[in-house]
Amino acid sequence: MPSLAQQLSEQNAGARERIPTDTLAVMDAATDQVASSGLVDSAVGVGARAPEFTLPDAGGTKVALADLLTNGPVVLAFYRGGWCPYCNLELRALQAALPEIEAAGGTLVAISPELPDNSLSTKERLDLAFTVLSDVGNEVAERYGLVFTIPEALRAVYDGFGIDLPASNGDDSFRLPVPATYVLAPDGTVAWRFAHPDYTKRAEPADVIAALRAL
């Protein structure tokens, strides 16, 4: 099976062949803006205490990070939403790696700003066996320092793609998290982190598993 990086690269190459040049320019400029903002560098990093949270899962049940940590290390995967093909590839790859993640002692949780009903749709569509949480309003992603606002020009592009963020997220803030993956030690400190301003780049599940095994 190809690595997640290979799958993401193929998805991106195909998209760039289909999408008009002027539209790509808008998308690339928005990614460059996130990169130049320094957001990723200032986000919660290795050695820091992971901000606590309690969020609803896809079924509406409240899930607290503190409770998850009582079972051992926790893997947090912040993603943009089920409308994002790169997120779907990442979630599928994490599902495929779930047995190894759990064998290494980890509890995997994915977090997006989507409403619980939309998170449930993503969970069912991708047949995910791990917990998917709804961070409506990006309050938790904000605590981790991962949130940015989508520029007006990119909003128009998303509209053209049929992506309705206000409907997905339940607000019109047009804010999203930078995709990021954290491995938390049982004491709640960040043992490993992957975050990238380019949303087509994601943590490789093998690296997540290696980080868990290194604890």
Where are these regions (language model features)?
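Short, positively charged
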Residues: 28-29, 33-34, 155-165, 213-214
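Structural microenvironment flanking redox-active thiols in thiol-disulfide oxidoreductases
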Residues: 90-143
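Thiol/selenol-based redox catalytic cores and closely related redox-interacting motifs
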Residues: 51, 135-201
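A generic structural motif
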Residues: 56-58, 184
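Short active-site neighborhood of thiol/selenol oxidoreductases, capturing the structured segment around
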Residues: 65-94
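N-terminal targeting signals for export/organelle localization
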Residues: 1-49
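A short, polar/charged loop-to-alpha-helix boundary motif
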Residues: 197-215
